[in-house]
C-alpha cells in the first residue's frame, strides 16, 4: 500500500448503537459512500473497514474535510504517526512529534484509548507521554490548548493531534427514498439536507410557475445538495410545468383559496412522481406560520390530499435558524438570488381552511392538466449536470412572453431602422452595468444582431436573480416571429 496520509474515521453514534447485523449493513453503506466521495476528488485512496473505526489513506490534501462531510461520520483525524503498540516507542515518538507544538502553547493534555492485549494500559500512556511533554507546557485536563491523542490497537498504535467534526447522522441510502418538493428558496434545501442526514435518499420535484430562468436557479441550488451532500446516491430533479395548471386554478377557484389549492396540486404532483419511482414519503420545507398557507388549519387541508406520509423537518424552526443552516449547507448564496415566483398571490388569502372547503373549491378543476404535466415532465440527472448544462438551455427564448420588457442592445441607427414595439434601447455595456435599475418583478427579453452579446448579458442578469433571456437567433429571428404573430408597430416605428 502506498505511503499516503492516513485518516482515522470515527463512526456516528447513530450507527454504533445499532444491532450488530444492522450496524454491519450501515457501515458497509458508509464505506460505499466514502468511496464515491473520494473517487471524484482526485488522487489515490484506500479504505480499510474495521468494526470500530474506518481507516482511509488518501492523496488529496482536502481529504479530511471531504470525509467529514459524508453522513455517518462523527469525526476524522489525520494520523501523525503509525507505529507498533510498544509503550516506549509511543512515548519517544510522541515526544519528538509534539514537543514543539506543546511549547508554542501554554497547556496540553494527553488522551489515550486502547483495545487488545498489551503489557500496559491507557493510563500508562497518558502518564508517561504526559511526563515526557511536561517540560514544554502545563497539563490542563479540562480545557487544554493542545490535545495529544493516542489510539492503541492489537497490532499497531496511532498518534494524532486534533480532529475535524463530521456531520454525523446515518449513511445516505439506509433509510429508503422520498421525494422533496423544492422551490429554490432557503427552506426546502435545508429540509432536504436534514432528511439526507437521516439516511434518506431523495429525488426532487419542482413545480415550475415561471419559465426557464427560474428552473435554472432551482437546478443550481439542488445541484449543491447533489454534489456536496449526496455521496453514494444519484438524485434527479423532476421539473413539472405548472403553467396550464395555474391558469386553470385561477379561472375556477376563489382567489383567497389559490395558495392552498396550489399546494394541494403540488402535493398531488409530488405523490405521482413518488409512486412512479418507488419513494415512500413526501418532504417539504414548510414551517408553522411562516406564510399564510402554513397555518395549522391550512396544513391540515393541504395534507388531506396526500396518501403518502408528508414530513416537514423545519416545522418548528424560525427563518433566521433556517438561513444559518442554509449557509452551512452551502445553498444560502444561491437561494438569496431566487425569487420564489407566485403568480397567484391574493390580497386576502384564507388563513384557516379545512379539507372539506378546499375540496369544494376544486370541484371544477381539470385534473387531467395536472396528470399531463406530470407525465410530460423532464428529468435532470443532477450529478451529471455540468456548468454548461446550467447555462445554455436556459439563456435563449424563441418567443416573447406576454408583458415582457424588451431591451434592444444594438446601435441607435439599427434601433431607428427597426425595433420591437415598445423596446428600450440599451447599449450592451449599459444593459450590464445598469441592470440594478431594473425591477426583478418583470421578465426581460434582450436582443442584438445575432443573439450572442445579449446571451452574455442575460447570463449576468440570471446570476443575480432576474428572469432574463436572449432572443434565439437575434434580430432577424425576432422580426420573423413578430411578423408571424402580427405584432403591430406603434406610430413612428418602422415595420
Can you annotate each of these PLM segments?
Residues 1-179, 189-234, 304, 352-353, ...:
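RNA-binding accessory domains that recognize and position tRNA/RNA substrates
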Residues 412, 416-443, 450-495:
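Rhodanese-like catalytic fold shared by cysteine-dependent sulfurtransferases
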Residues 223-251, 339, 344:
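A conserved beta-strand->alpha-helix junction
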Residues 330-338:
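A short alpha-helix-loop-beta-strand transition element characteristic
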Residues 128-133, 163-175, 229, 246, ...:
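Active-site adenylate/phosphate-handling loop in enzymes that bind or generate adenylated species
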Residues 207-210, 242-243, 286-290, 313-316, ...:
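Short, ordered loop/turn segments at secondary-structure junctions
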Residues 113-115, 364-417, 489-495:
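Flexible, polar/low-complexity N-terminal or interdomain linker segments that lie immediately upstream
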Amino acid at each position: 500500500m502506498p505511503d499516503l496520509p492516513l485518516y482515522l474515521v470515527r463512526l456516528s453514534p447513530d450507527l454504533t448503537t445499532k444491532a450488530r447485523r444492522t450496524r454491519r449493513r450501515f457501515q458497509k453503506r458508509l464505506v460505499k459512500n466514502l468511496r464515491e466521495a473520494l473517487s471524484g476528488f482526485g488522487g489515490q485512496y484506500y479504505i480499510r473497514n474495521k468494526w470500530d473505526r474506518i481507516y482511509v489513506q488518501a492523496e488529496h490534501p482536502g481529504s479530511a474535510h471531504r470525509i467529514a462531510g459524508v453522513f455517518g461520520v462523527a469525526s476524522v483525524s489525520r494520523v501523525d504517526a503509525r507505529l507498533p503498540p510498544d509503550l516506549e516507542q509511543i512515548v519517544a515518538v510522541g515526544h519528538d512529534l509534539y514537543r514543539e507544538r506543546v511549547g508554542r502553547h501554554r497547556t496540553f493534555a494527553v488522551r489515550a484509548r486502547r483495545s487488545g492485549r498489551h503489557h500496559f494500559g491507557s493510563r500508562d500512556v497518558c502518564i508517561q507521554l504526559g511526563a515526557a511533554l511536561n517540560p514544554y507546557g502545563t497539563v490542563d485536563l479540562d480545557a487544554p490548548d493542545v490535545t495529544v491523542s493516542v489510539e492503541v490497537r492489537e497490532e499497531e498504535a496511532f498518534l494524532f493531534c486534533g480532529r475535524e467534526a463530521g456531520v454525523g447522522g446515518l449513511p445516505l441510502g439506509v433509510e429508503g427514498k422520498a421525494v422533496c418538493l423544492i422551490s429554490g428558496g432557503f427552506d426546502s434545501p435545508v429540509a432536504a439536507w436534514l432528511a439526507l442526514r437521516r439516511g434518506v435518499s431523495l429525488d426532487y420535484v419542482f413545480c415550475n410557475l415561471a419559465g426557464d430562468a427560474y428552473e435554472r436557479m432551482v437546478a443550481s441550488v439542488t445541484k449543491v445538495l447533489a454534489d456536496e451532500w449526496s455521496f453514494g446516491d444519484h438524485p434527479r430533479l423532476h421539473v413539472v410545468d405548472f403553467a396550464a395548471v395555474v391558469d386553470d386554478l385561477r379561472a375556477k377557484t376563489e382567489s383567497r383559496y389559490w395558495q392552498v389549492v396550489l399546494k394541494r396540486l403540488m402535493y398531488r404532483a409530488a405523490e405521482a412522481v413518488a409512486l412512479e419511482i418507488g419513494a415512500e414519503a413526501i418532504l417539504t420545507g414548510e414551517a408553522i406560520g411562516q406564510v399564510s398557507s402554513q397555518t395549522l388549519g391550512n396544513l391540515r387541508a393541504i395534507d388531506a390530499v396526500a396518501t403518502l406520509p408528508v414530513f416537514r423537518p423545519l416545522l418548528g424552526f424560525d427563518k433566521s435558524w433556517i438561513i444559518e443552516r442554509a449557509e452551512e449547507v452551502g445553498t444560502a448564496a444561491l437561494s438569496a438570488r431566487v425569487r420564489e415566483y407566485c403568480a397567484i398571490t391574493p390580497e386576502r388569502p384564507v388563513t384557516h381552511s379545512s379539507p372539506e372547503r378546499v375540496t369544494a373549491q376544486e370541484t371544477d378543476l381539470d385534473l387531467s392538466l395536472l396528470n399531463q404535466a406530470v407525465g410530460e415532465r423532464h428529468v435532470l440527472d443532477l450529478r451529471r449536470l455540468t456548468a454548461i448544462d446550467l447555462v445554455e438551455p436556459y439563456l435563449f427564448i424563441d418567443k416573447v412572453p406576454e408583458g415582457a420588457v424588451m431591451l434592444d442592445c444594438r446601435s441607435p441607427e439599427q434601433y431607428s431602422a427597426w425595433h420591437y414595439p415598445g423596446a428600450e434601447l440599451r447599449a450592451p455595456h449599459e444593459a450590464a452595468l445598469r441592470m440594478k435599475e431594473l425591477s426583478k418583478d418583470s421578465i426581460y427579453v434582450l436582443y442584438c444582431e445575432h443573439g450572442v452579446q445579449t446571451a452574455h448579458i442575460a447570463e449576468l442578469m440570471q446570476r443575480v436573480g432576474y428572469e432574463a433571456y436572449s432572443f434565439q437567433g437575434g434580430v432577424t429571428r425576432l422580426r420573423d416571429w413578430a411578423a408571424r404573430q402580427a405584432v403591430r408597430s406603434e406610430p413612428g416605428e418602422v415595420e
